[in-house]
Amino acid sequence: MDEEMVEENMTNHDAPAESCPMPRASEAPADDVLTLILARSRSVAVVGASPHPDRTSHAVCTWLMNHTPFELYLVNPNAGDADIEGHGFYASLADVPAAPDIVVVFRRSEEVPAVAVDAVAADAAVLWMQLGIDNEIAAATARAAGMDVIENRCIKVEYARLRDQIAAAAVA
């Protein structure tokens, strides 16, 4: 890959989440890997879920509640008594009553290492960083604990895109 392409990829990679950057090839897991992760998972904790309807995390949580079989746990220490479609919030991953299969992160990249440590302590299987979010330290922490790591991908987009494959894998 020439320097111009590398620079272009880095520029796109560093763009804010709202611009929906495409993941770099090195961090984009194959569709069969994503399919297996999503088909085998039963519970998802969303760290940084927002009770505010104008936030992306709120829209993603609402979609997951209405279009997937996942048991959803919303994590936000500042949400108080708020809810999303009847789902209340937990102050931390440690407060979630069961080990989540997937921990989805809607936090700034620099805050993800602490979330990774919490995800390991919660015995999660997957650390999933949403669009525009990646962190090498967090990824290394999760991988060292045997977790799968997904960076810079939207769980809603991937689930919708792979819906048929997920359904087939769940039956198999």
Which residue ranges define each predicted feature?
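Mid-chain, well-packed structural core segment of small domains
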Residues: 93-133
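Active-site regions of enzymes building and remodeling cell-envelope glycoconjugates
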Residues: 85-93
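Conserved beta-strand elements of the Class I
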Residues: 45-47
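A charged, well-structured terminal subsegment
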Residues: 158-172
